Amino acid sequence: MTHFDVEKLAKKTSLRNNEYYSAQEIFDKLYKESKANKKFKNLMQLIVSEENIKLAYRNIRKNKGSKISGTNHRYIRDISKMSIEEVIEYVRKRLENYNPQPVRRKEIPKENGKTRPLGIPTIEDRLIQQCIKQVLEPICEAKFYHHSYGFRPNRSTHHAVSRAMTLMNKTKLHYVVDIDIKEFFDNVDHSKIIKQMWSLGIQDKNLICVINKMLRAEIKGVGVLNKGIPQGGILSPLLANIVLNELDWWVSSQWEAFPTRKNYSKIRILKSGKAYLDHSNKYRAMKESTKLKRMFIVRYADDFKIFCSSYEDAQKIFIATKQWLSERLHLEVNPKKSKITNLRKNYTDFLGFKLKLKPKRKQFVCTSHIADKQMERIQSKIKEEIKKLKAEPSRKGVMRYNSVILGQHNYYKIASEVNTDFKIIAYRVLRKQYNQLRRKFKTTKYVGVKEKLERYNRYKIKTYVHKVKNNKKETTYSILPIQAITNKPPMNFNNDICNYTEAGRKLIHKELETVSWKTLRYLRDNPVKNQTAEYNDNRISLYCGQLGLITKLPLKIEEMEVHHKKPKNKGGTDEYKNLIYVNTYVHRLIHCTSKNTEKRLMEKLNLTSEMIKKVNSLRKLCGSR
């Protein structure tokens, strides 16, 4: 395998991190045992293991939320200054007798004018939560329903919308039950979560005690709450899915997973060669011989829909689901937002889209638009960005504006009528664009970078451009046309994809093949003493980033050293971009100030002109030259 082949390999960051710390085999084993209904009674041993803590530190260090502080005003950079041994010791001591630090509450405004309370734990508690999440996730993933899509690996809102469209198009389920759980995250029953975890096989009493304390952590300025999951914690989304997983399987058991005496399912082979289990004969037999109601659930976090075939069925399902949520999960339904929708006559909103069935030839097909509230939000956002662009008519301003437009296009491109919707938005902001940008921008046909923005060029839409002259050279920056977008139909989630099986990983991720696993293990098991946790974590990813090579030759343990491009005594840091692996003798040459030593090292190394140029640039950065 060549260097260029390696660069093209599919990479999933979380899985690559698992490889760095040899955690993947452990997680795979947990997933397999959970599938076999094993009871887990000693999970704390895995949670406080050295590899798991190092992996947790790496995962939260890369997380954007690590730059947000809790009640103790500490950030990830404060943990990064500790040695990796100190971090491990800290986590282990805290979990011996765990008591969470107070949680900071932050109110986030919602579209309806109300606020959503976020509970932000301290960075240390988030590190501990990450340690727990890494071990619990494979166990829970083995038990979760296959059509829940929120806060789960490899799944997205697009998969949930795609599943809803598929049910509308192919199964003739033309009624949908929309149920809104009243303030779900604030009303979750703590004792119910613990029981559900126990039934999933998580039966480590020490761990359950720790999670129980996390749920009852004091919220600064509010006190201790007896119910609810604090939004903002790393463990919160997983706990929310544990709660609602019972709902998923209850709905599924009413039709989809209903047991039959005879096995009607058949294995069929697609043209692509992929095998799948066909349940159509089972559903046909159930429809003919039982009075069961056809129903399928699609859920994203606490936002879910139940599709059914008639209004009478929908009414019964609505009442039954409402009663089940109250009796089993102790959750109330919001009557104002809960309803039954005839999809042939009305739209139903789901995750920022509105869906409806329209007649086409002799059948009904799903048509989708951007939801009305989201149309208004996008319009307001673009107007706000136009103001900023007028104040900063530069390359940076244009790139910021373009990133907003591109972000909206990428999310809403799966709507079948996305082009029509963005044309409406473009028309509504046209006067604002003209008034704000006409003086500093010229109007011309779009001239984007062909390789990166190819889809816009064929529209021939007039857009605004900003021209900058620098040393007699003119550079043109174009703003992206709002309406230049076409529909890209969403794809259903492939249930073969799984982070915790070898076959499932191969569909999305290629394992490291060029690096020496022996060297990688040595780097992991032998952190540099008196260096920070950030330094020791980055030296592992740096080794893999350089493909285990230096000057196209394999790095050897006894000859490889990490060099700070900008020395720490001159303001340098342990950040990844400030580090580079070099040969021991090259490292001496970089810091060398003696002419004789320099000459001797040059003769020994026999460097090419390209290598000498690189060494000189490193010498200049560290002040040796």
Language model features: what each stretch is:
Residues 216, 221, 329-399, 403-406:
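A conserved non-catalytic segment of reverse transcriptases
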Residues 393, 397-457:
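Non-catalytic, peripheral interaction segments enriched in hydrophobic/basic residues
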Residues 57-60, 90-114, 123, 127-135, ...:
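Reverse-transcriptase-like RNA-dependent polymerase core
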Residues 425, 437-530, 607:
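Extended C-terminal regions of large enzymes
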Residues 1-85:
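Non-catalytic, polymerase-adjacent accessory regions of viral genome-replication enzymes
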Residues 102, 146-147, 152, 159-333, ...:
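Conserved polymerase palm-domain catalytic core
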